[in-house]
Amino acid sequence: MKTGPRSAFLYAAAMALLISPTAFSQQPSADAMFVNNLMPQPASLSVAPGRLVLTPRFSYGTTGFTNARLDSSIESAVAQIKLKTGLEIPLHAGAASSTELVVSVGGAGEAVQSVDEDESYSLTITSAHAELKASTVVGAMRGLQTLIQLVQPAGDEYVLPTVTINDSPRFPWRGLMIDCGRHFEPIGVIKRTIDGMAAVKLNVFHWHLTEDQGFRIESKVFPKLTAMGSDGLFYTQQEALEIVAYARARGIRVVPEFEMPGHSTAWLVAYPELASGRAPSAIRREFGVSDFALDPTREETYRFIDRFLTEMTSIFPDTYLHIGGDETVSPEWKSDPRILAFMSAHQLKDPDALQAYFNQRVLKILVRLHRHMIGWDEILNPALPKDVVVQSWRGGDSLIKGAEQGYQGLLSAGYYLDGMQPSGKHYLVDPLPSSALLTPEQRKLILGGEVAMWAEQIDAHTIDSRVWPRTAAIAERFWSPESVTDVDDMYRRLDKVSVQLEGLGLHHLTQEDASLRELTGTQEIEQLRRFASVLEPVSFHERYEQQHTSQLTVLDRFVDAVRPDPPSRHEIDLLIRKFLLAPREDKADQLALNHWFEEMMASVPAVQQQMQSSPRLAEVHLRAEQLPELAKTGVEAMSYLSAGTKAPAGWKQSKLALIDAAMKPAGIVRFTFIDSLKSLIAAVQE
C-alpha cells in the first residue's frame, strides 16, 4: 500500500492502532522484536526470545530427499529474500551441516499432485539456524513461503525471528477460478496469478476455458472450435502444457473447466450439428444466460465430447475435470417433438432430469479417462454417483445439502470477487462453519473452497486489482484454523502481503496510478489519487444495470482505474470506531480524522479542473460535488461529539439525506466510507 500524498498522517494513525498489544490476541509474542505479519496464519506458532541475523554469508542445504523441483523452490525463495533484504546471498546450496537454512524432505510426493497431497511442514528458527521439515516437496514449498514472510527489519539488519511453527492446511482444496472465456487473459497474466497463489498457499488453479464468448483452448481434433469461436484469442496446447508445468513447480494443480451443456455458444458456432435445435451464427457478445445448448439426445454429441475430453486429458493430468453444468436454458428441451419423445422414452420427466442424463453420460466418459467430475451446484441430482464434486455458487445451503446426500463439495458462494465486496466480508465466510449441522463424516466431504473471478467486466489491464489482495484474505480462510477471525488484524497483515505480491510482479497497486495518468493525460495526479482513494467500483450487477456492459465494452473508465476495497475503507473505519469509544477524550484520532476529511475537501478543485479536459473523468463529476459535503459532515459530527454538545434540530435528518443521495448510482463508483460516516452521524445527539 502506498501512503505518500494520499495521507501519510492518516496511515500512521491507523497503523498505530493496529500495532497494539490487542492486535496479537490470536498469536501472542514472547519477543517484542517479532511482528506477526504471516498470511495465512499457521496452525501453530510459538515465539522465543532471539533472532537469526541474515548476512551475505547466509547459505542453505538439504538433507534426505531432493530433486530439481525442490531445488528450484528453494532457490526461488532465496531469490525473494535477496530482493527483500538487498543482501547478496548466493543462489546455490552448501553442505547441510554448515548452513543457516536446512531443508529436510521425506520424499517427492505424488507424481501427479492430488487433493490428498501432504502439505504439512514444520519450521524451527533459532539464533543459529533455521530448519524446515516436510514429508513432501509441496509441504516444503508451503514452509518456504512462510520463511519469506518471516523476514523483517531490525535496526540496520534483517532477521528471522526465533519461532517454532507446525503447520498444515485446514482444507485440502484451496482454489482460484479465472474466467478466460468472457475475456481472454494472456499467458503472462496467468503466470503472475499463479505466483500470487503460491505466495498465499492456494493450491488449485481452476481454469475456466470455454464460454458463450470464446473457446480458449486449442483442439487439434476439432480445430474449428478456436478457428470460429475465439476471435483468435486462445491458448495453444503447448502454452497450456507450459502453464501446467509452471503451476506444478509451485505446488499448484490445474483443473480445467469446459462448460456443457449450456454456456456453449462457442462450441456450437463451430459445430452447429451438436445444438439442441437452433444453432448460433456467431459467438455471443452480450453477457447473461444464453438459450443455446448441446443436444443431450444425440449419440453424436457424446462421441464428440469423448474425443474432445480424451484430447484434453493428455494436456491436463489432474484427476479432476470441471464440466460447468450451470444455467442451462434451452427452449427446445421443453418444445422440440424429437427431444420430448426422447425424454418420454427414457422416463425423463423434465429438463432437469434430461440434464442429469447428460451428466451421467459425460461421467461415464470421464470414468473411462480416470477423471472425477466437478460441476456447479445445478448438477446436484440423486442420480449421480457420490464421487462427483459439487461446487456451490448459489449459496451455502446447496453445499450442506450435497454433503448430507454424500457428495463432496466446494464453496464459492461468498467468494465472488465481481461483487466488489471488501476483504473483511469475504474473510468471514467459512466453507464449514461450526454451526453447520453435519456429522463428522459429512464434514469431511467439504473439501474447501474457491475464489471466483468472473470476467464480464475485467481484462488483462484490470484483473490484478480485482483479484489481489482480496484473494489473500480468502486464502487465509481456507488454510488457517477456524478460530482465526480478527478482521482488523487481517487488514494489518494484508497491507504487508499486498506489497509482497507487488514484488512478485502483480500490478494491483501500480495499475490505478497508470490508469489515472491515462485518463488525464498528465503525470500530475496527486489530488486525483487522493480523490480516487475513497471511491471503488460498484458490483457487477450494478455496473451492468448502469452501463449494459458486453464483451465489446472498452474497460478504460474511472471505474476501471479504482480498486475494490482500497486501504482507506478500513483505515477510516478503524479510526472512527476508536474515536467513538471515547469521543470527548480521544483528541488524537479526532485530529487524524479531521486532517483526512480536510484533505478530501482540498482534493476536489484540482480534480474538477482536470474533468474539464477529460470526458471520461467527468463521468464522476457528481461524486466530486458530493465529497466536500460528506467530508464536512464528518468534521461537524466529530465537533459535536468531542464537545459533548447537541446538534441543531434537523441536522441529522439533513445529513442522512445527504448520505442517501451519495448512495444513489453515479459514475459507476461508490464511496468507501459511507457506512463509517453514518455511524458518526448516528452517535450525534440533537
Residue ranges and their predicted role:
Residues D31-A32, L38-Q41, S46-V47, L54-P56, ...:
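Substrate-binding groove of N-acetylhexosamine-processing glycoside hydrolases
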Residues M1-A12:
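Bacterial N-terminal signal peptides that target proteins for export
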Residues Y11-P21:
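Bacterial N-terminal signal peptides
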Residues G324-A341, H346-L348:
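N-terminal leader/propeptide and maturation segments of large enzyme subunits in energy/redox metabolism
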Residues E88, N203, R253, H372, ...:
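Residue-level detector of anion-binding/catalytic polar loops
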Residues Q80, E110-Y320, D336, R361, ...:
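Feature activates predominantly on carbohydrate-active enzymes
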